Amino acid sequence: VRGISVGVYQSSLPPEIAYMLQYTGASVVLAEDQEQVDKLYEIRSEIPHVRYVIYEDEKGMRGYKDPWLLSFAEVLERGREHRRKHPDAVERLLLEASPEEVCHLSSTSGTTGRPKAAMLRHRNLIHMGVALQEVDPLLPTDDYLSFLPLAWIGEQMMSVAMALTGGFAVNFPEEVETALQDLKEIGPHVMFSPPRVWEGIQSQVWVRISESPRFNRFVYERLLKVGYRAAEYRMRGRPMPLGLRLAYWLADQV
């Protein structure tokens, strides 16, 4: 629909949200749940340009009777009705769009001052995805687990730009707290995050291993060595010896 998106972190405080909405002139806000909606109510007088707040999770929202609020389900129904009346509207907007149009505002970290918004065009995002595909190609059969905020440019790069150019499936955890369990169930081919996230995951894994029975620790340590050896061959682009291929296959079954 030729809109421009901008991300705000879930952990942002009301004054930080107010600044970002004022700075970008946002007219519609998509909020996850009651907690985020309440933050917006705190700053409502400061953001008169916001016409609607769309909330996804309806839990706890029954008592909110305000035309300012729309449930995501209601927005979908309005979209279906509009589609019935104007079946070619979306296609017309797509044809009118230009690769040079701004489609996303990516905020800086704000560590040295208030965050600034970098303007990204459609061409910027697609070029980013194409360039990544040339360096580290992914296949349409691959699964990617998105568990970091879309307000971060790294997640925009993977879940939007690279997914559009590579065509792989983007999976999301049910909740932030269940990300590790969901990771095990989904078994993604690729993940992306800054080092501190990997360090946190590694720490949780090591704690669970240290608390497991002695036999489990023994098996884990042996299979970890197999994984390291296999990774070395893969990263160098060399074929694994038959014995290592067999050991890696067995480790994968475990």
Across the structure, where does each feature detected by a protein language model lie?
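Conserved S/T- and glycine-rich ATP-binding loop of Class I adenylate-forming
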Residues: V29, V102, T108-T111, Y144, ...
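Structural core segment of the AMP-binding/adenylate-forming
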Residues: G3-R78
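Conserved pre-ATP/AMP-binding loop-to-beta segment of ANL
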Residues: L69-S107, R114, P137-D143
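Short hydrophobic/charged patches on amphipathic alpha-helices used for structural packing
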Residues: A18, E91-L94, L180
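Short aromatic/basic micro-patch
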Residues: L30, L69-L70, E96, M119, ...
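Conserved AMP-binding/adenylation subdomain of ANL enzymes
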Residues: I126-D143, L150-Q253
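A short hydrophobic/small-residue beta-strand
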Residues: S5, V28, Y144, V170-N171
